[in-house]
Structures are given as structure tokens and as C-alpha cells.
Amino acid sequence: MTHPQKTPLYDIHKERGGKIIDFGGWYLPVQFTGIIDEVMTTRKEAGLFDVSHMGEIIVEGPKALEYLQKMVPNDVARLKPGKILYTPMCYENGGTVDDFLIYKMDENKFLLIVNAANTDKDFEWLQENNTEGVELKNLSDEYGQIAIQGPKAEKILQRLTDTPLKEIKFFNFKEDVDLDGVKALISRTGYTGENGFEIYIKAEETAKLWEKIEDAGENDGLKPIGLGARDVLRFEVCLPLYGNELSPEITPLEARLNPFVKLNKTEDFLGKDVLVNQKEQGLERVLVGFEMIDRGIPRTNYILMKDGQEIGFVSSGSQSPTLDKALGLGFIKPEHDQEGNEIEVKIRKKTAKAKIVKTPFYRRG
């Protein structure tokens, strides 16, 4: 039996009182001071996240762009060096292999940031379909990754560098930034809905940088944030979580990722026929947001009903600390997708009333 892997920050999390769990084969902190406190800290001050478990895959070669255009439904051709694209990646049947970010390093080199639990599966799928002869490298073990998110994130990080961070726009990145002696790639991205950055460094420099950022933010309320709060933060802004809102059985169109599926790009891509067919014939289910009217918290895989009939299931649900409401995401038959429409959630043996609401639930300022 293989033991979970440790990120370069494992010892620091233990020192800070992090409650460590096995998350998708990694030892990671689920919480430090408590989920509600950590969510509100990130929304109001700034939070520091260990995301070193995420996978890093390099795609390189003269045909790198041609290859990626085949592999993903988004249009990688419109990406310029220094910019980032979010995309799903599909199987031939339209189901989702993963969703990830693509960083364009230069004309023939791209960096993919993939979900931790999917890294090996993604790498195999990328290799299996590599008829273009591009070079594929899984460099996940060489990278550490730290995210700093929240209204004070930029102010705190700026204390460590002369590089003007305000010049790094949303979904842009800069390489070789000197953070108090640590060389880093910095992007203005995140999984919280707040302003902030994701920072890529050599694995062996991760702990040193983490402590430098902690010191820089100690008077601004910066705190370490665990996976529990990270999940609530992404849920409040309705960002999909692989395994919940995306899976091999769920297509990007069902998950409402239409802006990231370019059916009219000139290149064919894996899964295109199925997605075109779904768009033309209509979807059998669609992702919606809902708010509880009755007491109760919707949990993953609870059944959704209308007039006593099953119409779908919950993909994610939580009490929202930011909005002080019980909210859910779930897949339902499209005919029930009208804002304000009342549905029921089967919570244990009872049903509780809920209503369809607009997403995202929360938008920053």
C-alpha cells in the first residue's frame, strides 16, 4: 500500500497546528483555525494556501500548439506568451478527463497546471494521443506551489519584490520574479474568487518562501488556509471541482463551461462530435445553483426532486459563511432550470424545499 505524499510544506503545517488529512494521495491540512474563520480571512484580509500537490506538465515542440488544439476544446491559438487559458479536456465520448490552466511560456512551449489526483491519468492520456511527436514532461515533483488570495494579497506580496505586481493582469503571468531572493513564476490566478496570485517555485525553496510571505503579512491578518475553506471559497463562486461538477460522465457543456468550449474553432478536438451533438439536440441535464428555503444543508449525491419525481442530484453543497445561506450546486433536467423555481432536496428521509438561483452565488465587490 502506498503512503500519501507530503508536500514541501508538510512540517510547517504540523508546526502551525494544521489538521492533516489524506487528500487524493497527499497529506494536506484540512483546516488551521477553522473553516468559517479561514473563509472570512480570505474574503476580508488574505489567505495563504499550499497547492504544491497540483500537477505541472510541460508540452514542448514545433507542433505543441497543433497538439493542444486537438487535445482541448478551448482555443489555444489565441493565447499569447505570458498569458493563461482555462480549459476542460475531453474523452472521445465528451466526458471530462480534467480541467486545467495552460500557461504559454513561448511559441512552442506550454505549461499545464492539472488537478493533483488526475496528474498521472492526464499525463497518460496526453501521451496516448501524442501523434504529433511533442515532448511531454511531468515535472510535478520539481515544483512547489503557493497561492496568496484576498484583498490584501497584492500589498503583502509586493513587500517581497521590486517587480510591480499591479502590471501582472488577470490570467497573465511573469517568470523569474525575485521574491526576496527566491526566483518564482507568478500568475494572477486563483480558486477563490478573490484577487490574488499563484506562485511556482522550486520544490526545495517552497518552505523558505512560505515563511517569507508569512512574515510579510503578519500585520495584515494573513493566515494559512486549509482545504476545507478552499473548497467553500471555490463553491461560493461556483468554480467546478473535478469529481463533483466534472467527471468522465459529465461533459463540459452539462457543467456550463460553454465559454471554454470553442465548437467553431477550425481544428477538430477530442470529444467534439459528442459536444456538437449535445449543443444541437439539447442537454439531458444541466448544472444549476440553488438556495435552501427549509433548514438543511445539501450534500454531494443527495437527490433533487420536483413534485415527488426525481429530477437530478447535488454535486456540491455547503453553508456559505460569506452569504450566511445554505447553498447547493447540482445537475437537473433542463426544463426545471428557471430562476425562482422551487425544488426539493432529499435530506435523509425528509425532503427540504429549495429554489433555483443565479450563479455565481458570490461576486467580489
From Swiss-Prot:
The lineage of its organism: Bacteria, Bacillati, Bacillota, Clostridia, Natranaerobiales. GO terms for molecular function: aminomethyltransferase activity; transaminase activity. The keyword Acetylation does not apply. It catalyses: N(6)-[(R)-S(8)-aminomethyldihydrolipoyl]-L-lysyl-[protein] + (6S)-5,6,7,8-tetrahydrofolate = N(6)-[(R)-dihydrolipoyl]-L-lysyl-[protein] + (6R)-5,10-methylene-5,6,7,8-tetrahydrofolate + NH4(+). SUPFAM superfamilies: Aminomethyltransferase beta-barrel domain, Folate-binding domain. The keyword Cell division does not apply. The glycine cleavage system catalyzes the degradation of glycine. Belongs to the GcvT family. InterPro entries: GCS_T (IPR006223), GCS_T_bac (IPR022903), GCST_C (IPR013977), GCV_T_N (IPR006222), GcvT/YgfZ/DmdA (IPR028896), GcvT/YgfZ_C (IPR029043), TrmE/GcvT_dom1 (IPR027266). Keywords: Aminotransferase, Transferase. This is Aminomethyltransferase. GO terms for cellular component: cytosol; glycine cleavage complex. Its EC number is 2.1.2.10. GO terms for biological process: glycine decarboxylation via glycine cleavage system. The glycine cleavage system is composed of four proteins: P, T, L and H.
